[in-house]
UniProtKB/Swiss-Prot annotation:
InterPro entries to which the protein is assigned, alphabetical: Tscrpt_reg_TrmB_N, WH-like_DNA-bd_sf, WH_DNA-bd_sf
Name of this protein: Uncharacterized protein AF_1662
Superkingdom in the source lineage: Archaea
Length: 89
């Protein structure tokens, strides 16, 4: 099942997070993003999580089509290797 593959991949990417926190974090992200625009940094501060962890959760949500890629504005560093800013609209 494709959902299982995405979930397994996502959980493997989040080894530092307790699995119990992930569903709550996803719910909070979706609730906040439905109400207001903010940058990745602002969202991380509001949720009190590390940006790296937030980025992994957002990637998972995009893969699962909970957040549309068209609603995310990504700005990469000059080398193109690292995410500098992510605006959610």
């Amino acid at each position: 099942m494709q959902i299982h593959n995405y979930t397994s991949k996502f959980i493997l990417n989040l080894r530092k997070i307790s699995i119990m926190k992930v569903p709550e974090l996803i719910d909070e992200i979706l609730l906040i993003l439905n109400e207001e625009e903010m940058t990745e940094r602002e969202l991380a501060e509001k949720l009190r999580v590390e940006r790296a962890m937030l980025r992994k959760v957002l990637e998972f949500l995009m893969e699962m089509d909970f957040v549309e890629r068209a609603n995310l504005k990504l700005k990469l560093s000059e080398s193109g290797r690292r995410l500098v800013r992510l605006d959610v609209y």
